[in-house]
Amino acid sequence: MKQIFKTEMKRAMSGKGMVLSILIGTVLGIAHVIREIIPAYRANLTNFYNEFPILSPHSAAETWMAGSPSNLEGFIFFLILPILASLPFGTSYFEDCKEGVIKNIYMRTKREDYLKAKYAAAFLSGGIAVLVPLIFNLMCSLVLLPNLAPLSTMGDNILTPLMLFYKIFFTHPMIYTTFFLVLQFLMAGIWACVCLSVSFLSDYKIVVLIFPFFVQLILHVICTITNHIDYSSVYWVQPGHGIIAWWIPVVYLVIGISVTFFVFMKKGVREDVF
């Protein structure tokens, strides 16, 4: 199992899908730096805040791509996050079956070991692909903007005292941001494994790849039209939006990991590849 996991991780990290995913995410991150962070940096250099002391200078925690739910690049990034997470290795099982590679693998190792290694590699590579552009954008924000504690009034965020870890955001914003980076990593891993678990449903790779995106899109639309936008994974993974109840990420994570692992393992063990 250890050796096959190393092999799968090497395939995931060195594949074209990983490069493409990070490239797309980084382009969005750079666009956000140009449209939001640099103008905020220039605004901080003026005397505007001396004339209006009630206002606070732009801070890194509020201005980076996930610091405010109102910026376009951040919305696009988190909307297509399932695709970004699936590009590196989400379709790898589908490709192994189509190309006949899986037959050779099954003659050298146990099915369960291969499937577990595949699941773990897809989960980790999906999380890494999503986290790299986010950390890049956050670092750009920290380089150009001060790491000030945000204000509860007149800020770019929409956090209220009802939000989870509300006080931490306004006292230690980077600790709060790090917590959300972990959540973003986990959700990206889950979306990659959703892609993995539906490899059995279609004969077309593109259908397998975009399936997680449409799952999130449908959930987002339902949350929007029912006026429960706080439940949409497009928003609650963003620190600038916040989490209104602790059970929201718990439900997503528990159901996401358990269902995808169960379906992938059960279907994978029974799948006739010979």
Where are these regions (language model features)?
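Secretory targeting signals
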Residues: 24-84, 90, 94, 119-192, ...
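Aromatic- and glycine-rich beta-strand/loop motifs that create alpha-glucan
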Residues: 1-26
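Junction motif at the cytosolic side of a transmembrane helix
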Residues: 197, 254-274
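Central hydrophobic cores of alpha-helical transmembrane segments
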Residues: 21-26, 205-219, 256
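Extracellular/periplasmic helix-loop-helix junctions in multi-pass membrane proteins
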Residues: 202, 209, 222-247
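Helix-loop-helix units of permease transmembrane domains in multi-pass membrane transporters
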Residues: 92-125
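Transmembrane helix-loop junctions in multipass membrane proteins, especially transporters and channels
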Residues: 37-45, 138-150, 204, 224, ...
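Membrane-helix interface segments
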Residues: 17-18, 110-112, 116, 204-209
